[in-house]
């Protein structure tokens, strides 16, 4: 789903909802670029040694993430240390700051309008730069179809890394079910793919989406990120 028209539209033609979304996207584009800086990969995690073992209390910073994203203490601590590359389209781009909360070392490469079928070059570049980590989160499919062969090419480049594949919810577009069927098939085909069923989790939850029914609202971003984290991190 292309947001280019929204991004370049004059401010006075946007609704309050659209203007807020545009600002969110622009902020997350900056954050995503910053995640690619190797100097940013080391110092942003919560201090997981900040425990109060004598009283048995969970530190406030850990407890906040537990509540917000419905995670266990152990999952939050794992997330602070996990190496993860998140590669996707504007749906993932919108979640950049949320992902960074749970996974401070995450590398986010997400752009508006990205298609799976032309993502191979970008994956190769991330790999060349040492930014394709051992865990790869794929958030593609919102903008159109791809073939099994194109998906295979992507997986060949990714190699034996653990892949977390998020399926899609685009009820206004004819390709939604075909994309999700392909992803189901690929999750069965590849042992190193874990399917994250955003389509199922978000069913019947209109408040989780902005007015376009595709991009998550603020609440939806929390639900989206929490679902990812609960699938990526051991319980």
Segments the model singles out, each with a brief description of its role:
Residues 1-83, 230, 235:
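N-terminal secretory targeting modules
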Residues 105-107, 162, 192-194:
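Conserved beta-strand segments of alpha/beta enzyme cores
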Residues 108-110, 165, 197:
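Structural signal for conserved beta-strand scaffold positions within catalytic alpha/beta enzyme cores
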Residues 154-180, 202:
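Active-site segments of SGNH/GDSL-like serine hydrolases
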């Amino acid at each position: 789903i292309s947001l280019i028209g929204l991004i370049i539209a004059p401010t006075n033609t946007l609704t309050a909802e659209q203007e807020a979304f545009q600002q969110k996207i622009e902020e997350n584009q900056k954050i995503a670029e910053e995640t690619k800086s190797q100097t940013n990969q080391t110092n942003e995690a919560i201090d997981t040694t900040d425990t109060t073992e004598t009283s048995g209390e969970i530190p406030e910073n850990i407890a906040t993430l537990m509540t917000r994203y419905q995670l266990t203490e152990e999952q939050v601590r794992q997330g602070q240390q996990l190496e993860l590359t998140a590669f996707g389209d504007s749906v993932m781009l919108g979640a950049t700051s949320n992902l960074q909360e749970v996974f401070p070392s995450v590398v986010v490469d997400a752009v508006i309008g990205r298609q799976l079928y032309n993502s191979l070059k970008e994956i190769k570049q991330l790999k060349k730069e040492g930014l394709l980590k051992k865990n790869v989160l794929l958030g593609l499919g919102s903008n159109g179809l791809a073939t099994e062969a194109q998906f295979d090419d992507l997986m060949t480049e990714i190699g034996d890394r653990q892949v977390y594949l998020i399926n899609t919810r685009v009820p206004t577009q004819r390709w939604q079910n075909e994309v999700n069927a392909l992803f189901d098939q690929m999750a069965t085909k590849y042992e190193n793919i874990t399917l994250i069923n955003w389509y199922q989790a978000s069913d019947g939850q209109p408040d989780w989406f902005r007015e376009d029914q595709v991009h998550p609202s603020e609440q939806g971003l929390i639900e989206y990120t929490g679902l990812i984290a609960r699938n990526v991190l051991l319980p």
